[in-house]
Amino acid sequence: MKTQRDGHSLGRWSLVLLLLGLVMPLAIIAQVLSYKEAVLRAIDGINQRSSDANLYRLLDLDPRPTMDGDPDTPKPVSFTVKETVCPRTTQQSPEDCDFKKDGLVKRCMGTVTLNQARGSFDISCDKDNKRFALLGDFFRKSKEKIGKEFKRIVQRIKDFLRNLVPRTES
């Protein structure tokens, strides 16, 4: 025979299961990293694999591309890191380190997943060689100056030729 006590017990279990059902999706959502958190995790991996003396820290994060909602699908990322003053052997977070004056800058591209439990990344970084950028600026400015000078020379030749043509007196 069923007692009132059994009814309360069944009601409690139902309530526990209902609450558990409501909390589980929140736990799953909490395991999804934000775009920036996934990039910071990738930078931690870059620092672990690096043979450079100092840690790198996020300098610039390109805007987040439009993405699907699946946290297991690799998402494209691109960002720039800069060398900090903290040695790689330190246990300090790169975010707590100051950038090194004239520190090495690297441009990084690849993919990250936002699933915290199975988070992965495939990132490659190249030195952001400012010398080549400066060389490009030099050639662009030189081209502009040469173009202006060329136009000036052409105008002087035209003026000279106009003056050579015999003038008729009226």
From Swiss-Prot:
Consequence recorded when altering residue 160 to A: Loss of antimicrobial activity against M.luteus
Transmembrane segments: none
One of the GO biological process terms: cellular response to peptidoglycan
Signal sequence residues: 1-30
Keywords from the named record: Antibiotic, Antimicrobial, Cleavage on pair of basic residues, Disulfide bond, Immunity, Innate immunity, Pharmaceutical, Secreted, Signal
InterPro entries given in the database record: Cathelicidin-like, Cathelicidin_CS, Cathlecidin_C, Cystatin_sf
Top-level division of the source organism's lineage: Eukaryota
The keyword ATP-binding belongs to this UniProt entry's keyword annotation: no
Effect of residue 157 to S: Loss of antimicrobial activity against M.luteus
Outcome reported for the amino acid change (mutating residue 150 to A): Loss of antimicrobial activity against M.luteus
Effect of residue 150 to S: Loss of antimicrobial activity against M.luteus
PTM entry text: The N-terminus is blocked.
Residues that make up the propeptide removed upon maturation: 31-131
Record annotation: effect of changing residue 149 to A: Disrupts oligomerization. Loss of antimicrobial activity
Domain notes for this protein: The cathelin-like domain (CLD), which is the propeptide part, does not seem to exhibit auto-inhibitory function, as it does not inhibit the antibacterial activity of antibacterial peptide LL-37.
Other facts: The propeptide shows high sequence homology to cathelin, a protein of 96 residues isolated from porcine neutrophils, and is therefore also named cathelin-like domain (CLD). Cathelin was initially classified into the cystatin family of cysteine protease inhibitors based on its inhibitory activity against cathepsin L. Human CLD itself lacks antimicrobial function and does not inhibit the cysteine protease, cathepsin L.
Name the UniProt record assigns to this protein: Cathelicidin antimicrobial peptide
Lineage of the organism: Eukaryota, Metazoa, Chordata, Craniata, Vertebrata
Gene field: CAMP
